């Protein structure tokens, strides 16, 4: 079915169409792949390739994304199975809400440390290199390269170790982010920092989850 056909079904029978989409693997796998890709991008490209050290809130955000990956994969096993679908929904909601919470905190810290007014740092809690994950999961010990914070919150500019020789491509990216004093979606204009980009990703997922879950609930109520 093409996009026009899907749009027609959504307009004529929105609830049934949304429920039918949930019973297919595509949406669940799309969520898992999207969040997994963001984790890999943050780790492999920005952390390893560009030497942007992750902070405490950054690894918490990775945890939230990882929860959503697991939820999407569980639901994708059989989206028509109510138990598996419910587990996927709960994990997706939990991950997106938790991700928004950590992203908001990181955004507040980012604005405080980049504010020329020293009073803006008053009351701002600093970052720890010894993270405490939900349920006391020892992720920093299990996978330190992925979940061990080594940077400071709010400061995400590349820090290249002494003696490292960068390729021309690495040098271009590193200089761009160093000049902008951190990660931005559009570095020259300081448009959308990393925390705000994560807020957008989690927020979009949460809105879609609310819509999908609402349609599922209406379908159950109607019988």
From Swiss-Prot:
Report the record's disulfide bonds. 55-58, 127-153
The keyword Transferase belongs to this UniProt entry's keyword annotation:
no
Question: PANTHER family from the entry?
Answer: DISULFIDE BOND FORMATION PROTEIN B, PROTEIN-DISULFIDE OXIDOREDUCTASE DSBI
Q: What HAMAP family is this protein classified in?
A: DsbI
Task: Please give the chief subcellular localization of this protein.
Answer: membrane
Superkingdom as given in the UniProt entry: Bacteria
> What GO terms are given for molecular function?
protein-disulfide reductase activity
Q: What does this protein do?
A: Required for disulfide bond formation in some proteins. Part of a redox system composed of DsbI and DsbL that mediates formation of an essential disulfide bond in AssT.
GO annotation terms (biological process): protein folding
Q: Which residues lie on this side of the membrane: Periplasmic?
A: 47-57, 103-197
Family affiliation: Belongs to the DsbB family. DsbI subfamily.
Q: Which organism is it from?
A: Escherichia coli O6:H1 (strain CFT073 / ATCC 700928 / UPEC)
Q: Which residues cross the membrane?
A: 26-46, 58-78, 82-102, 198-218
Q: Which residues lie on this side of the membrane: Cytoplasmic?
A: 1-25, 79-81, 219-223
Q: What is the protein's membrane topology class?
A: Multi-pass membrane protein
The name on file for this protein is Protein-disulfide oxidoreductase DsbI
Subunit architecture: Interacts with DsbL.
Q: Which InterPro entries match?
A: DiS_bond_form_DsbB/BdbC, DiS_OxRdtase_Dsbl, DsbB, DsbB-like_sf
Q: Where in the cell is it found?
A: Cell inner membrane
**UniProtKB keywords:** Cell inner membrane, Cell membrane, Disulfide bond, Electron transport, Membrane, Oxidoreductase, Redox-active center, Transmembrane, Transmembrane helix, Transport
Q: What is the effect of changing residue 55 to S?
A: Loss of activity
Q: What GO cellular component term, any one, is given?
A: plasma membrane
Entry's induction text: Expressed from a tri-cistronic operon that encodes AssT, DsbI and DsbL.
């Amino acid at each position: 079915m093409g996009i026009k056909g899907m749009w027609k079904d959504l307009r004529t029978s929105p609830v049934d169409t949304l429920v039918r989409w949930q019973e297919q693997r595509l949406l669940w796998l799309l969520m898992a792949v999207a969040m997994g890709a963001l984790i890999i991008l943050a780790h492999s490209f920005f952390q390893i390739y560009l030497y942007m050290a992750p902070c405490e809130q950054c690894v918490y955000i990775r945890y939230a994304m990882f929860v959503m990956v697991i939820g999407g994969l569980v639901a994708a096993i059989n989206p028509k199975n109510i138990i598996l679908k419910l587990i996927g929904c709960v994990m997706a909601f939990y991950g997106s809400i938790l991700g928004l919470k950590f992203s908001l905190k990181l955004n507040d810290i980012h604005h405080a440390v980049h504010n020329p007014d020293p009073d803006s740092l008053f009351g701002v809690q600093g970052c720890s290199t010894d993270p405490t994950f939900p349920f006391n999961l020892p992720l920093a010990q299990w996978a330190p390269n992925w979940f061990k914070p080594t940077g400071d919150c709010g400061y995400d500019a590349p820090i290249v170790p002494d003696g490292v020789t960068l390729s021309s491509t690495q040098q271009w990216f590193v200089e761009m982010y160093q000049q902008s004093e951190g990660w931005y979606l559009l570095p020259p204009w300081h448009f959308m920092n990393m925390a705000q980009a994560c807020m957008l990703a989690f927020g979009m997922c949460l809105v879609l989850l609310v819509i999908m879950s609402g349609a599922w609930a209406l379908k159950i109520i109607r019988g």
